[in-house]
């Protein structure tokens, strides 16, 4: 049966909404958008089927880059999540991996598609999102105790961790711990975290 999802949108938005959406000045659900089928076909705008999470966000970004649009304060449809959907299941390391992959893909597709004069601004915004989700995924690999996998992931993302432009102090600290590639430190962090969770 799944879970019915019907969030509430309260405003009518129109025009070029890309940066308002980036900065969360406007918020709308994909079910509030009027989209011509012809526009989708002409611009090859479809959901990325490789994404298990974040496919709606990726689609909305690409749509906002392509055209001005209307977002109405009503939900045109409801959708049900499958019973085994990632969206209504407990958070696991799989969630974090798929989120990290989604934000990698979003960064690539948006940077490739956007041709305006604010590309550096978009790069900064999406790089922060990408770094945040990647750090969160790697941190959960650490907490899971899979240090061999973690070491491989850190090595393949070493430059990004060292050049990290994360905004939060906690996230910056985590990035430094991950980038250290210090197995003893990683084990200590995991041990402390497990003790905290047992309290």
Task: Describe each PLM feature range.
Residues 115-125, 165-169:
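Short, surface-exposed acidic
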Residues 1-4:
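Conserved donor NDP-sugar-binding/catalytic core segment of glycosyltransferases
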Residues 124-140:
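Amphipathic alpha-helical repeat scaffolds of TPR domains
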Residues 9-96:
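Conserved nucleotide-sugar donor-binding catalytic segment
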Residues 57-60, 103, 107, 130-135:
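Hydrophobic alpha-helical core bundles mediating ligand binding, dimerization, or RNAP-core interactions
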Residues 138-199:
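Membrane-interface aromatic/basic loop that binds lipid-linked glycans or pyrophosphate carriers
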Residues 17-18, 121, 149:
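Exposed alpha-helical structural elements
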Residues 75-83, 89-118, 136-161:
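Catalytic core of nucleotide-sugar-dependent glycosyltransferases
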């Amino acid at each position: 049966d799944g879970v019915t999802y019907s969030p509430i949108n309260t405003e009518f938005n129109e025009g070029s909404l890309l940066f308002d959406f980036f900065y969360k000045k406007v918020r709308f659900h994909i079910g509030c958008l009027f989209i011509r089928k012809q526009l989708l076909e002409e611009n090859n705008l479809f959901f990325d089927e490789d994404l298990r999470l974040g496919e709606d966000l990726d689609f909305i970004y690409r749509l906002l880059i392509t055209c001005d649009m209307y977002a109405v304060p009503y939900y045109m449809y409801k959708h049900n999540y499958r019973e085994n959907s990632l969206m209504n299941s407990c958070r696991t390391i799989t969630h974090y991996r798929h989120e990290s992959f989604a934000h990698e893909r979003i960064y690539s597709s948006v940077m490739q598609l956007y041709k305006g004069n604010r590309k550096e601004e978009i790069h900064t915004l999406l790089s922060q999102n990408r770094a945040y989700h990647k750090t969160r995924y790697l941190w959960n690999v650490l907490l899971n105790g899979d240090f061999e996998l973690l070491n491989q992931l850190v090595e393949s993302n070493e430059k990004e961790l060292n050049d990290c432009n994360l905004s939060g102090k906690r996230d910056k600290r985590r990035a430094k711990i991950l980038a250290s590639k210090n197995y003893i430190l990683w084990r200590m962090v995991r041990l402390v975290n497990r003790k905290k969770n047992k309290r």
